[in-house]
A protein has these predicted regions:
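Short, flexible, surface-exposed loop segments at domain boundaries
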Residues: 2-5, 17-61, 65-201
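Sec-dependent signal peptide hydrophobic core
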Residues: 11-16
Length: 201
């Protein structure tokens, strides 16, 4: 059963909350990745990659976002992007890039530790100031408040578009990425993969 649209506060307010949560320097919030198995009365159930099913209450101001398939052509100067990267041979190399809709510019801006895998990785949400082509790769110069990064985007990197989502996208069977609030009691945001898409972050 899909949740009523009335369960969601305005997307604008939810986006602000999501940004504040993700912008915390220590990034203490837990993440849950898995497949949506139920959504009813403000609570969702998710089967994790480990096969466990967890029940998660949504915060009243929870944000709802959708990722859809994209490609390297979307990575352009002036775009605001999120990138999960790893240190490889003395440089940062992207595993995935999510290109934000312009309405989400500035969301969770910064460069901070991430948890895509057990080995150290970082999330960088920043503006692309320059794009260079180096062989088949692209090298991005990125600027954010308080710093800058240079990250290589190989052709193997997953690229998705990231936008706000209506409640009807919260459908059973969809892959989801969930950001819990600081005390772990409720979901602050849910990133939903479009049909056939897994949130890569």
């Amino acid at each position: 059963m899909l949740m009523s649209r009335s369960l969601w506060v305005s997307i604008a307010a939810a986006t602000v909350v999501f940004a504040l949560l993700l912008a915390a320097p220590a990034f203490a919030q837990a993440h849950i990745r898995g497949t949506l198995t139920a959504a009813i009365d403000g609570t969702i159930s998710v089967q994790t990659a480990k096969g466990e099913t967890v029940s998660i209450k949504l915060a009243n101001d929870a944000g709802l976002f959708l990722v859809t398939k994209s490609d390297m052509s979307a990575i352009q100067t002036g775009k605001f992007v999120g990138i999960t990267s790893f240190e490889e041979d003395g440089k940062r190399v992207a595993r995935e890039v999510h290109v934000f809709d312009e309405s989400l510019r500035g969301l969770a801006e910064g460069h901070y530790p991430w948890d895509l895998e057990s080995k150290p990785n970082m999330m960088t949400n920043a503006n692309i100031s320059k794009v260079e082509e180096v062989g088949t790769d692209r090298v991005l110069m990125l600027n954010y408040k308080g710093g800058e990064q240079t990250i290589t985007i190989p052709t193997s990197a997953t690229v998705v578009a990231f936008d706000k989502a209506p409640a009807d996208q919260l459908a059973v069977g969809r892959k989801v990425f969930i950001v819990m609030n600081k005390d772990g009691s409720e979901a602050a945001a849910v990133v939903i993969g479009a049909e056939g898409v897994k949130p890569p972050m």
